[in-house]
Amino acid sequence: MAEASIEKTQILQKYLELDQRGRIIAEYVWIDGTGNLRSKGRTLKKRITSIDQLPEWNFDGSSTNQAPGHDSDIYLKPVAYYPDPFRRGDNIVVLAACYNNDGTPNKFNHRHEAAKLFAAHKDEEIWFGLEQEYTLFDMYDDVYGWPKGGYPAPQGPYYCGVGAGKVYARDMIEAHYRACLYAGLEISGINAEVMPSQWEFQVGPCTGIDMGDQLWMARYFLHRVAEEFGIKISFHPKPLKGDWNGAGCHTNVSTKEMRQPGGMKYIEQAIEKLSKRHAEHIKLYGSDNDMRLTGRHETASMTAFSSGVANRGSSIRIPRSVAKEGYGYFEDRRPASNIDPYLVTGIMCETVCGAIDNADMTKEFERESS
């Protein structure tokens, strides 16, 4: 591994302890035109106690695939902020949505459209829980911890594994977990996955638009923590060909009616609605997902919709406990690890709760290529 790529956090520590003299640092984070994250920091004169106190900002969109060079200013509108686990103190990390200079949402800003659906269906109290899988690579783009020029033993001992040779980079995973907890994210768990150096964290339950906000912020923290360890994060749904599991972002969903006794009826109704829009959902469920949804490695076929109780080879899984109790939630196993959560939660709300006149998540996705 290239040692120079790893941050010198021990040297940095003495500077982090310096008095900021009443000012704070706000790190603005946004989604660029490639589905990746960007950020930059600015000084504010006092501690922030409300989102309304945060100023709008701008950046060069021609350098992020979000605007042409002749009209490159893109505006950052703060939508959420969190305690900064890296700078700590009163410093914050700000999630910002991107808007063009005419006030319209940038074509890669899918939050704006999804928020309309959640506002229209506020009384449904739709909850989400996302299971974010990802793969670790070293600075030479080899899977982290794998034998150089070779492969580890076949899958089997790695899922929720314990012990050297079964899990890799647990220190980095733990650091990310703690960073999310410090920032107040609803991170609900972590585990090693089926393929060695593949991990998962879960965020939720979160209501409506907050789900997308929190997943993006958890991803940002993951990348930042990984910087310090000299590790690259991949959200590709099939980072390695062959007999290795892919990476998904299983999406757990419930409405207020589903969570109440007798809610199974509403779960079944939702699954029926989802079956009729399978192709539309797949379109929004991540790029290269065809490499993952093969019907093997705990996935369903990409071309055929299916559902079942406790069946991890189906499109929609109803947990055994939910089937037994008769209410709860369902899991959509189709989304890939590289999804935009605003697209996925938005179309889920649209399908399950109902379409509205001024929002269309399929057309929203198609704006990217316009």
From Swiss-Prot:
EC number from the UniProt entry: 6.3.1.2
Residues modified to N-acetylalanine: 2
Subcellular location per the Swiss-Prot or TrEMBL entry: Cytoplasm
Cross-link (Glycyl lysine isopeptide (Lys-Gly) (interchain with G-Cter in ubiquitin)): 283, 324, 363
Gene Ontology MF terms: ATP binding; glutamine synthetase activity
Domain GS beta-grasp: 24-103
SUPFAM superfamilies: Glutamine synthetase, N-terminal domain, Glutamine synthetase/guanido kinase
A Pfam cross-reference name: Gln-synt_C
UniProt KW Ligase keyword: yes
GO BP of this protein: glutamine biosynthetic process
Protein name: Glutamine synthetase
Protein source organism: Saccharomyces cerevisiae (strain ATCC 204508 / S288c) (Baker's yeast)
Gene name of this polypeptide: GLN1
